[in-house]
């Protein structure tokens, strides 16, 4: 995926250590090495030793460290419980040094995310989740307040309207169970162009928080 105005970087695996640029070379099988790098030249023979606990920043995180953060940790997050999930978000926010951030709720339908298999389509009292918060979403809302946007429920309520589509009978049944319309999906977890277009409404949360006009 390439956003408008985005160009593929000329070099991959570029990182920063103590404000200096390095390049990671090699493979996991043959061994990884790190060497000093500049836009003009790279010396692959000048390998550098990186000691334990050294902070290594990816090129993107270093060069975008003062940007507004839009964070979404979903099925690939590698967390085992909500406390660990919150600690991962907090670490990214604190490391960036930026007070301007938006936390985006996961958009897998309840019960389908491989990150949180405890979620289902019903509340504890047996009623359907619908557009209410799941335990996962409630945890993020409690931790981050107005910085959190429940993207799943936004897409249920507004997704089809945003892109000029009409809900089907199946959509209405799915909404009741907390499911996003299949008209917005490419597969069980990813969106098609309609879904990602509607997800762009994240900008409205930034306006609400005063980040943009």
Q: Which ranges hold each PLM region?
A:
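Alpha-helical cap/lid subdomain in secreted, periplasmic
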Residues: 5-213
């Amino acid at each position: 995926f390439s956003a408008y105005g985005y160009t593929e970087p000329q070099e991959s695996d570029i990182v920063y250590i103590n404000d200096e640029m390095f390049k990671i070379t090699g493979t996991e099988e043959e061994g990884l090495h790190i060497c000093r790098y500049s836009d003009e030249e790279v010396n692959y023979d000048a390998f550098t030793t990186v000691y334990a606990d050294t902070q290594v920043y990816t090129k993107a995180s270093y060069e975008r460290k003062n940007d507004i953060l839009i964070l979404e940790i979903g099925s690939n997050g590698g967390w085992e419980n909500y406390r660990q999930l919150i600690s991962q978000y907090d670490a990214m926010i604190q490391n960036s040094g930026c007070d301007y951030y938006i936390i985006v709720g996961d958009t897998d339908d309840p019960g389908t995310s491989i990150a949180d298999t405890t979620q289902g389509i019903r509340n504890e009292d047996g009623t359907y989740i619908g557009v209410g918060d799941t335990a996962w979403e409630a945890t993020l809302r409690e931790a981050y307040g107005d910085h959190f946007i429940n993207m799943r429920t936004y897409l249920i309520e507004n997704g089809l309207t945003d892109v000029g589509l009409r809900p089907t009978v199946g959509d209405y049944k799915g909404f009741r169970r907390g499911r996003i319309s299949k008209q917005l999906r490419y597969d069980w977890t990813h969106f098609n162009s309609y879904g990602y277009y509607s997800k762009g409404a994240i900008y409205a949360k930034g306006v609400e928080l005063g980040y943009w006009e």
